[in-house]
């Protein structure tokens, strides 16, 4: 079970297909009780992999006070909403009822990127308004079925940021969110140390695939898979 959870978490955390949605669906199909706190513990494994992949972005942010301030602004919406509605969000992980809707929404967002070409804006010059908007977009990823990487990268592409900067900023945004969720989840789940290790290894592979798909402008192709999972979750419900 640890192997399965770790691989599913690692692959789906960074591919734009929603890790929380897949874990919720998997929990329902296997008749296991996997709540939001337990998925948060799995995030600790993927956190290490994203830090390794985001080293360039981390170096850039350390040289730019604007990036650091923008990351704080981008983190606030999801952080505040997650604290205020913690119980309600946790309840969404116990039922696949809304998964078809949320997976379909992710598919639609990804499909639109097919018609949005990469721009020239860089994260060093990001406005506070853009930082807030992408932070609000990340807020929706608290719902299982909405992909965090999918909605944040897509939002930045829609705002005409370079594909490389959209990737790096999305990676940087995930670090405080995943770290905070993982710390909250420590000691509250029954996931062993093996699951985060498997999540780390599969997360590295997923990050490589995501990077190639965004840089080649083919992230929209994941929309077909999200539609498939939306149908599957509807049938499973």
Swiss-Prot record:
Domain of life where this protein originates: Bacteria
Membrane topology: Multi-pass membrane protein
Keyword Chaperone: no
Compartments where located: Cell inner membrane
Reactions catalysed according to its record: di-trans,octa-cis-undecaprenyl diphosphate + H2O = di-trans,octa-cis-undecaprenyl phosphate + phosphate + H(+)
UniProt KW Signal keyword: no
EC number assigned by the record: 3.6.1.27
A GO BP annotation: peptidoglycan biosynthetic process
Top-level enzyme category: hydrolase
InterPro entries cross-referenced by the UniProt entry: UppP
GO CC annotation: plasma membrane
Transmembrane segments: 38-58, 65-85, 92-112, 126-146, 166-186, 191-211, 217-237
Protein keywords: Antibiotic resistance, Cell inner membrane, Cell membrane, Cell shape, Cell wall biogenesis/degradation, Hydrolase, Membrane, Peptidoglycan synthesis, Transmembrane, Transmembrane helix
Record-level Gene Ontology MF annotations: undecaprenyl-diphosphatase activity
Function noted in UniProt: Catalyzes the dephosphorylation of undecaprenyl diphosphate (UPP). Confers resistance to bacitracin.
Family membership: Belongs to the UppP family.
Remaining remarks: Bacitracin is thought to be involved in the inhibition of peptidoglycan synthesis by sequestering undecaprenyl diphosphate, thereby reducing the pool of lipid carrier available.
Protein name: Undecaprenyl-diphosphatase
Gene label: uppP
């Amino acid at each position: 079970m640890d192997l399965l959870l770790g691989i599913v978490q690692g692959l789906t955390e960074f591919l734009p297909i929603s890790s929380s949605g897949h874990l919720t669906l998997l929990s329902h199909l296997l008749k296991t009780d996997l709540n939001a706190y337990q998925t948060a513990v799995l995030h600790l494994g993927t956190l290490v992999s994203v830090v390794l992949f985001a080293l360039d972005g981390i170096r850039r942010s350390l040289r730019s006070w604007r990036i650091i301030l923008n990351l704080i602004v981008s983190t606030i919406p999801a952080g505040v909403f997650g604290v205020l509605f913690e119980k309600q969000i946790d309840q969404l992980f116990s039922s696949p009822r809304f998964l078809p809707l949320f997976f379909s929404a992710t598919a639609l967002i990804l499909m639109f990127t097919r018609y949005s070409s990469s721009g020239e804006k860089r994260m060093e010059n990001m406005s506070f308004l853009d930082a807030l908007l992408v932070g609000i977009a990340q807020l929706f990823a608290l719902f299982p079925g909405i992909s965090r990487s999918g909605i944040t990268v897509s939002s930045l592409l829609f705002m005409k940021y370079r594909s490389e900067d959209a990737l790096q900023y999305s990676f940087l945004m995930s670090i405080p969110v995943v770290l905070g969720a993982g710390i909250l989840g420590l000691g509250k789940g029954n996931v062993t140390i093996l699951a985060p290790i498997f999540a780390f290894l599969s997360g590295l592979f997923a990050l490589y695939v995501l990077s190639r798909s965004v840089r080649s402008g083919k992230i929209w192709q994941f929309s077909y898979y999200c539609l498939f999972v939306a149908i599957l979750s509807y049938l499973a419900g």
